[in-house]
Each structure stands twice: as structure tokens, then as C-alpha cells.
Amino acid sequence: MKATGIVVEYNPFHNGHQLHLNKARELTKSDVVIAVMSGSFVQRGEPAIIPKWERTKMALAAGVDMVIELPVSFATQHATIFAEESIRLLDALHIDTLFFGSEHGVSEDFSTAAKTVVENEAAFNETIQLALGDKKTSYARAYTDAFTHLFGKELLDVTKPNNILGFHYALAIQKQNPSIALQTMPREHSGYHDAEASHDYIASATAIRKLLLAGNLEEASRYLPDSSIEVLNNYRGPFLSFEDYWPLLKFRLIQASSDELEGIRGVSEGIQNRMQLAAKKAHSFSDFIEIMKTKRYSNARLQRTALQILLNAQNTPPAEPYIRVLGMSKTGQKYLSLHKKNISLPIVTTVSKAEPSLLKEDLRATDIYTLINGLEDYQAGDFHTPPILTL
């Protein structure tokens, strides 16, 4: 069986995702599509708008054959780690092709860039470190400048969010298993972070979340497939943003000592001291981020650091990667059965039977995620919710 892998968040699953999924199956001529998906918290350092189980239902209903969870210690990291660990899981599942959307849309350019960076890695990293010597320069800017220095601006614009993720997927494949084919499709209509919908049936997940958080499910439905609308209509919990977790984060910042926070993943350069001061002044999470924002620290980096503090994620090596199955179609079940003996990573379908150290961070993250009123039905869900299976 030929397998295509995709890296997703489905926050929530919308018409653009449906187009991407359909093209993945059509263009790669695969028998099975495997999605590695962020769980309770996503890459920009935010809570998912609805629980991972609801997003898994959306994915399966739309045609994904297997949904596996990207562990939170990787899912909430910067693009390099996010991509490396996503590819590690998909490679363990023996995918033939990685399919992704990008603003650039030319597969060969991603592969060319990745191969060149690997061949010139020492010089590339040195250029980044030199740029970071300027305390006003963010890591993202330093990385972009190093890339432009190596290639010029013609090959690939890595200031675009899908391009930079695609490049890191290509880089991870080049380092881990260059035999995995890389295929992209151009992103259509809506920009990744567009806050407003600007098309009849395609809108960014950002714009859709904004509508849902404002209570405009009917308007948001224009941009969702019927299968996602059905999941949302049956969902009885709240739509979530970091504002819901602000009291918990504020308590944590006020209660903890600076030395304690210094041991949290992503905390560096004394940023915890500024965060503790900002927490006392801010009245909301958006207010907190606005107070904290500088040229060196992007919103995404600040949110990721704040999230690590909320989750009490210690700056120690994360657990070994594992394959946590959230859901499968009948085809996905057949594929897993065929390959199970040849999969090098631990496979988790029943949490209570898994090695406790593997899932420690993810279980804590889900426990914190479900502290919000209205999510009582999902509390301890990692223990009593089996993989969702469809016929």
C-alpha cells in the first residue's frame, strides 16, 4: 500500500484542508493518507480551539486514513523541531511521499534548498549565530537572513509561513530519509494568518477561529465542509483561546520564582523576569503579549514560551518519540496491521498500557487543557478514549 504523509493541526478542519487532502490523494496516487496532528496545544503556542478528539473526527470524516498525535513537547516548538519530529513519526510509518501546501508551490526548489543547506550546514549556522549577536534580531529574522545570504531571494521566500515549514520538512527529510518524495501544492486564496475571510468558500483557520470565538458558527460554516459542521453542531464544549487560560498563566507567573521559571523549556536571556512584571500589569493574555512584544521576540515565540510556563515543561530532554494513534479508517487499520512489525517506534493505542514516561508531558498537557469550564467530559480523556475507528 502506497502511503502519503501530511502534517496538520486542523484547528479546525476547513475547506482549504479538504482541498489539500483531496489533492494529496489525487496527485500522489496513494492508497492511504496519514496525518500527524498537534494535540491539545498547537505550534504557535495556543490551545486548540476544540479538543483533539473532535478534530480527529473531522479528519476521518473528510477522508484521512490515520491520525497520529505529535507529542506536545514537539508540537509546541519552533519550526525546526516541529518539522523534524513530524517527519520522524511519518518516516517510522513508512510513508512514500510527504505532501504539503506552500505559497511557493514548486517541490524541486524545497529539495534543492534543503540539500544545499545540509551540504553547507556549518557555514549556515555560523551566519545565524553572527546575526543573533545583535540583541534586537529575532531567531526567525536571523534564519531568514542566513537563507537569503546563501540563495538570494529568487529560490524560495522563507518569510512566508508555509514556505518556511515546507523548507524545514524538506530539511528533515534530507537528514533522516532522502528517499521520501516531497510534493507541494500552491496555497490558494487565503493567507495562513489572514484574520479576515476574503473568499466565498476558503478562509484561513485564523479567520475561522475568530468567527467561532465571536459566536458566528453560521458564518464560519461557509468555510467548512459539511462533515466539520456536523462535528461542531454536536460539540457541547467551549471554543478556546489563550484568553481562557490567562488566569492560570498569570497565577503561575506570580507564584513561581525567577529561578524556577529559568528551568522551563524556552526560557532564556532573563525573559522570565520581564514576563513576571508584565503579568502584574496585564489584564488579558493579548494585553500581556502586547506589553512583552519586541523586535527580538515575535508573538509566536512569546506565546510558545508562555505556554511552556503554563505547562511547567522542564528544560530537560523530552521523552522518546512514539506513535499515538488517535483514529483510523478501515484502510488505515489495514495499513497499520500490515506494517506494525516493521515500525521502530512504540505504538500507543491504549494509554493505560503504555510506558508512563513516554506520555507524561502529553497527559499533563491534556489535564491542563481540560481545566476550563465546559470540558468536564474530556477530563482524563487520554485514559478512557480509545482510537476513533470508522468503517
Swiss-Prot record:
It comes from Listeria innocua serovar 6a (strain ATCC BAA-680 / CLIP 11262). It is found in: Cytoplasm. It comes from the Bacteria. Its EC number is 6.3.4.-. SUPFAM superfamilies: Nucleotidylyl transferase. InterPro entries: Rossmann-like_a/b/a_fold, tRNA(Met)_cyd_acetate_ligase. This is tRNA(Met) cytidine acetate ligase. GO terms for molecular function: ATP binding; ligase activity, forming carbon-nitrogen bonds; tRNA binding. ATP binds at residues 7-20, 101, 162, 187. The lineage of its organism: Bacteria, Bacillati, Bacillota, Bacilli, Bacillales. GO terms for cellular component: cytoplasm. Pfam families: HIGH_NTase1. Its main location: cytoplasm. It catalyses: cytidine(34) in elongator tRNA(Met) + acetate + ATP = N(4)-acetylcytidine(34) in elongator tRNA(Met) + AMP + diphosphate. HAMAP family: TmcAL (MF_01539). Keywords: ATP-binding, Cytoplasm, Ligase, Nucleotide-binding, RNA-binding, tRNA processing, tRNA-binding.
